[in-house]
Amino acid sequence: MTQTLSQLENSGAFIERHIGPDAAQQQEMLNAVGAQSLNALTGQIVPKDIQLATPPQVGAPATEYAALAELKAIASRNKRFTSYIGIGYTAVQLPPVILRNMLENPGWYTAYTPYQPEVSQGRLEALLNFQQVTLDLTGLDMASASLLDEATAAAEAMAMAKRVSKLKNANRFFVASDVHPQTLDVVRTRAETFGFEVIVDDAQKVLDHQDVFGVLLQQVGTTGEIHDYTALISELKSRKIVVSVAADIMALVLLTAPGKQGADIVFGSAQRFGVPMGYGGPHAAFFAAKDEYKRSMPGRIIGVSKDAAGNTALRMAMQTREQHIRREKANSNICTSQVLLANIASLYAVYHGPVGLKRIANRIHRLTDILAAGLQQKGQKLRHAHYFDTLCVEVADKAGVLARAEAAEINLRSDILNAVGITLDETTTRENVMQLFSVLLGDNHGLDIDTLDKDVAHDSRSIQPAMLRDDEILTHPVFNRYHSETEMMRYMHSLERKDLALNQAMIPLGSCTMKLNAAAEMIPITWPEFAELHPFCPPEQAEGYQQMIAQLADWLVKLTGYDAVCMQPNSGAQGEYAGLLAIRHYHESRNEGHRDICLIPASAHGTNPASAHMAGMQVVVVACDKNGNIDLTDLRAKAEQAGDNLSCIMVTYPSTHGVYEETIREVCEIVHQFGGQVYLDGANMNAQVGITSPGFIGADVSHLNLHKTFCIPHGGGGPGMGPIGVKAHLAPFVPGHSVVQIEGMLTRQGAVSAAPFGSASILPISWMYIRMMGAEGLKKASQVAILNANYIASRLQDAFPVLYTGRDGRVAHECILDIRPLKEETGISELDIAKRLIDYGFHAPTMSFPVAGTLMVEPTESESKVELDRFIDAMLAIRAEIDQVKAGVWPLEDNPLVNAPHIQNELVAEWAHPYSREVAVFPAGVADKYWPTVKRLDDVYGDRNLFCSCVPISEYQ
């Protein structure tokens, strides 16, 4: 044997697991596109002046097992204290049936946002359940399918309040002084760019303030007090002030719904419904409003509609409110939400049902009553008489109490003057309460749980009678049926089977990077060392997190060519917002706050103009030339016209048209010449890593979609992560945090997310990916992504012309197929092709973006040549079907394309089509069949007959 031990150890084995085509397949594809090697191909495609001379120094690759062992050692540095800190985060019990069948199931976590409803009915149903939970608990009429976190939801509530306010000249937003501090932090950040004045005061003093358009109250205050705001809300409504209420989802099981008290908007975190704290996230926020405000709501809304056969079907409703359509006029810049986490919360509610949830909530409250009674019996004073799960305990020897707590590995809330906060949760036990007595009273307290239980069971006054819920919740059958594990497992599987995810087929969505989310990358997110930490625990308890985050940030700095990375943004859109705020504050620091014009190419993703608007900027569109590139003449003219008011340009690279623009450095130079900054959207970073970098190109700031390039799964529409990389001059202006000092970040800026490191518990996924790939693997991944896209483009060019190409007719990592000539010639549209692909077992490419009448295809590096050929064969077969329509063999109004997709029921129904059942459902020899459960949806019906709560169970059967 001639191999060395190093070769046998094969530290780069994961590279071959992650990259779909093996060496032989890569060579076949290189031959097909006319290139000798990967280096030769990328050398032809990527402009010479931006190619890196040396690879980023991120280390050698590691095996899956070595990387897991290394990360486990880092995770073990985290200390798992029992946290009673509260402030919007509590420990949970995630039911194992949900853990195994959803969180650890690629059928759920590798799906995409349900823009294609025919292949998304399962998660759409779970999201509809989430909306129903929200409606029942808040007492309002309309709910969204999740926002990024509670603090972001508060900022969205403020923006929405201004949109719907009848007090058009009012410009002040009132925040009650006992909202969570991180909520206030994010609200203040958003208010600054909108020009709102934020007033913080005791809620009962709100009427002392003039010119208020909206009010934010918190039903259970940050230190635990339950407020009955019925009379105050009534008075505010009489003055036409929009009222938003932050609520605790578990407390709402027992407390009066704020909507019943007159609130216009109610929101909060769904974290308590089964989602681990995870050092701050990811967590879904719930958001509800009155029906009259539905068209002003932010985020996704799931609606009930009909399919082509008249059957009930679900879809994302009222998308005309959203950034991908309305751009800078959108209600929000939200693109990613928190679908996977919302679905965990919704299934937590399904599994426990109303009876189970009431038992959990009552048990938490009972233990809190017992703790309160014992403390009061021993002379301790409580700040609040009315509470659900949180006590604010006045203590004479605060230092001594905190020292005993630390010795017992307990975290109490310590930032309250002369008091400590204690928040109990569903994991709290009798033993925990006895331990708390010892911490607060000493070991010789002499208290007995059972005796205290009898006392409070007969005389609990901690919830005001007027605040006790008197209506039933979760009466829909879906919440009252699946309570055995067998039934729950089957229900979840029935939902999963309705959807198309990466565990079944390639998802060739352009601008989405639906690559492999490897099992080894996913394993660490469920480790208790990562999952169970409170985001506001003392930093010495999170040394493992700090080390992991610091390493990941260092790698990202090297891969991007920037000087610093901020991990706080919870999504790409939020990263855009954070990056633009950094630019805004940088200009202000130089007394150039008047710079507010943001140049955006016409080809840009809708989040770009929406984020610019949210950051207080004016959007000026820059034209693209006939080749899809930024028109330099127009750019120079627009930059010169903006002059001293030019803030920045937002540009995507490679371009959204799927091309490496030759003039990208000149674009940066023009903007810098006029005093602007360059924001390079990181959406297409998968075609840069190891080959070039934003910093090397000349950009000043970028967000990175960790859920694209760096392997965090899309989760069916979230979670995402959008950390920003910045040059040194912008580093002081990245988001900070009011509760936790972010080590290494000398920033005084406000927060954009509730937690200091955003969705910290999914960062191990990207850490694992980079560690296992190493520098050589990361570059190769980019190169193979480019090869795969060019292979598809070259094979489909004759059937579906590629709209834009760069040098030598090449594309970057994605290509746009132009369907417009075919549509004009035959009447068959890009929509028909997209739906017909479902019959062939594929998710559609991106439709009509960035150019109407096109399909944008991004195969990623993870798809093998076998899968690419299967997709290509399907597209060529569809082209042959279009030719049949063109030839008159099938009429335009009745053919396999316009009737697609086809469902199983049609096999046994009467058949009157001019093509066979076999052609309909087993086209071109398709054997491994994915079956959609609904036919093409009627979008017009869905928006005209908006219905966003659960339908009768019979409709699903």
Curated annotation (Swiss-Prot):
UniProt entry tagged with the keyword Secreted: no
Catalyzed reactions per annotation: N(6)-[(R)-lipoyl]-L-lysyl-[glycine-cleavage complex H protein] + glycine + H(+) = N(6)-[(R)-S(8)-aminomethyldihydrolipoyl]-L-lysyl-[glycine-cleavage complex H protein] + CO2
Cofactors demanded by this protein: pyridoxal 5'-phosphate
Alphabetized InterPro entries for the sequence: GcvP, GDC-P_C, GDC-P_N, GDC_P, PyrdxlP-dep_Trfase, PyrdxlP-dep_Trfase_major, PyrdxlP-dep_Trfase_small
Keywords: Oxidoreductase, Pyridoxal phosphate
Enzyme Commission number(s) of this protein: 1.4.4.2
GO molecular function, one term: glycine binding
GO cellular component, one term: cytosol
Pfam families assigned to the protein according to its UniProt record, in alphabetical order: GcvP2_C, GDC-P
Residue positions, PTM N6-(pyridoxal phosphate)lysine: 708
One of the protein's GO biological processes: glycine decarboxylation via glycine cleavage system
Residue ranges of coiled coil: none
Alphabetized NCBIfam families for the sequence: gcvP, PRK04366.1
Membership in a protein family: Belongs to the GcvP family.
Subunit structure, interactors included: The glycine cleavage system is composed of four proteins: P, T, L and H.
Known role: The glycine cleavage system catalyzes the degradation of glycine. The P protein binds the alpha-amino group of glycine through its pyridoxal phosphate cofactor; CO(2) is released and the remaining methylamine moiety is then transferred to the lipoamide cofactor of the H protein.
Name the record gives this protein: Glycine dehydrogenase (decarboxylating)
Organism field: Escherichia fergusonii (strain ATCC 35469 / DSM 13698 / CCUG 18766 / IAM 14443 / JCM 21226 / LMG 7866 / NBRC 102419 / NCTC 12128 / CDC 0568-73)
High-level lineage: Bacteria, Pseudomonadati, Pseudomonadota, Gammaproteobacteria, Enterobacterales
Gene: gcvP
